Amino acid sequence: MVLYSFIYKPLMENINTENFKIIYLSLEMKAEELFLKLLSIYIWETYGKEISYKELLSRKKGYKLSDEDFKIVEECTPWLNRLEEVVTVYDKTLNADKMYAYLISELSKYGSFEETETRKIYVPNNPNRTILVVLDHILLLRKNKGRTKKEEIDLASNYLITLRNRCGVSPVVVMQTN
């Protein structure tokens, strides 16, 4: 549901514009799995055909992707190529400090950080661009030495607030509880 509500819908509304970017910090799944899940949703919405990401990989026991389904996947290639342009996925382990450093590096591709006499500011290359920063999910952040899990989450939240205020990004933080 998170993928559909917070990623897929905004993505589809903006996929053909240069004014939209998603930086996805995927602590729960690899980039390939994320893209395949998005492709599965896209195929359902576009073709009315349900093909799970495991079926797309032919990893479901006793299942082989049919020629018809393979043709559908091939027809989705332009969409997948555009998806890779719009969504940048970081799928390695992270702590709050590493997250902040990575986001500063990524945001430098879309603008510049400049020092004024009183503070550091961000000047976007395209002021109309919306950048979603998705952290999925925050409980999987690694603790840095000397910090508790709560302190790590609090620090990551504070970093995201700083980036929201300085750079105008829209953070989406996913937290799951069992």
Residue ranges and their predicted role:
Residues 12-128:
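Cytosolic-facing regulatory segments adjacent to core modules
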Residues 1-20, 26-27, 92-178:
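P-loop NTPase motor core
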